């Protein structure tokens, strides 16, 4: 059950996209900008370009297309062009990419601006390693492509008021953080102690970097960590963490699935949060972790590169590694552990982390600036 993954997805989203534009005429509203997101809404700028740009009620609207994850492009056989999408054959070249219909590619072609969910990701998707085949479509559209980092809801994720964590705390009164750690260990069945607690809340899939985690997991335990994992996904990773829980019953806790309240307790109760992603368009977990004074250990990719400053810098908020390599990740984990035992430096780091601002305010300013530029309102 859900919004995606049905045999008739193309028809569903074609209908929705056409309905959006028809609805504007019915309610007699002409926006200056339409900002469509991902392949599910990619037909909105396409339909506008083909059918509505000369409509007396809708002419002059500018279209922004936002890519959240370029892996999901809306690819279908060419046979749906006319019957399902309702697009005349002479527009086939607009819709076609590598002998298929590609809805995301078509939106990239016709949109006035293309945005992504982080500045680094907007550059990475020009590289075949990240683009899932769309680098050719994007290479000559760089002039209209940019990236704005997403934000988080700082009211929902607020350690000072969050009712789902065992104790509240602030940047100036951190005592509740330790209570959260103690209660987390109690809830997941691990013994109390001063050892650093490493948290992970994630889908257990290859592109989240879990092959790196598998490679050096024993080494992480040997560094003295307790590890708390919440997630589900590929069977190989679920099985691995079940085995690690059995192998290290006093060091490893694994909950298969997703429990929102437990996720919050991990964000609040862990000392470090590991995100070794192979690719990460934006990522929100690292921002949430910072909010709760939990130090991110991340691979420097996509939004992780834009949001976490390595502690080699005096303004550092976490630990980063560049190469997609298990031992580079392990070294970052070791650096975090070494800092953890230097309580003066660790407290300074936690303070910097909790003061980092990843609200929507900055992102909103950037989008408003883009919209004003397109609307001619400098």
What residues fall within each predicted segment?
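Catalytic cores of nucleotide-sugar-dependent glycosyltransferases that transfer UDP/GDP/TDP-activated
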Residues: 1-378
């Amino acid at each position: 059950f859900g919004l995606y993954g049905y045999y008739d997805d193309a028809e569903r989203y074609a209908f929705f996209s056409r309905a959006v534009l028809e609805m504007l005429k019915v309610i007699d509203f002409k926006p200056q900008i339409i900002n469509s997101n991902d392949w599910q809404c990619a037909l909105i700028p396409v339909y506008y370009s083909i059918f509505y740009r000369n409509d007396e009620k809708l002419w002059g609207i500018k279209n922004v297309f936002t890519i959240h994850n370029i892996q999901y492009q809306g690819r279908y056989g060419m046979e749906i062009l006319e019957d399902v999408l309702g697009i005349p054959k002479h527009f086939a070249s607009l819709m076609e990419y590598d002998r298929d219909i590609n809805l995301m590619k078509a939106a990239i072609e016709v949109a006035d601006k293309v945005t992504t969910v982080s500045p680094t990701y907007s550059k990475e998707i020009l590289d075949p390693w990240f683009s899932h085949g769309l680098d050719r479509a994007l290479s000559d559209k760089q002039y209209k492509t940019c990236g704005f980092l997403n934000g988080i809801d700082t009211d929902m994720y607020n350690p000072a008021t969050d009712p789902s964590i065992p104790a509240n705390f602030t940047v100036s009164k951190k005592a509740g953080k330790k209570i959260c750690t103690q209660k987390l260990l109690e809830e997941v069945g691990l013994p109390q102690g001063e050892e650093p607690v490493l948290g992970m809340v994630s889908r257990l899939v290859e592109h989240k970097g879990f092959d790196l985690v598998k490679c050096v997991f024993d080494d992480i335990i040997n560094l003295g960590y307790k590890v708390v994992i919440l997630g589900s996904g590929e069977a190989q990773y679920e099985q691995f963490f079940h085995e690690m829980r059995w192998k290290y019953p006093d060091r490893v806790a694994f909950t298969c699935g997703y429990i929102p309240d437990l996720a919050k307790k991990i964000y609040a109760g862990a000392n470090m949060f590991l995100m070794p992603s192979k690719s990460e368009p934006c990522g929100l977990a690292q921002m949430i972790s910072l909010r709760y004074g939990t130090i991110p250990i991340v691979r420097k990719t996509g939004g992780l590169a834009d949001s976490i400053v390595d502690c080699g810098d005096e303004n550092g908020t976490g630990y980063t590694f560049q190469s997609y390599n298990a031992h580079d990740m392990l070294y970052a984990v070791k650096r975090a552990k070494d800092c953890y035992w230097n309580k003066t430096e660790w407290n300074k780091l936690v303070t910097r982390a909790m003061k980092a601002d990843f609200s929507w305010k900055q992102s909103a300013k950037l989008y408003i600036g883009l919209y004003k530029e397109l609307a001619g309102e400098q």
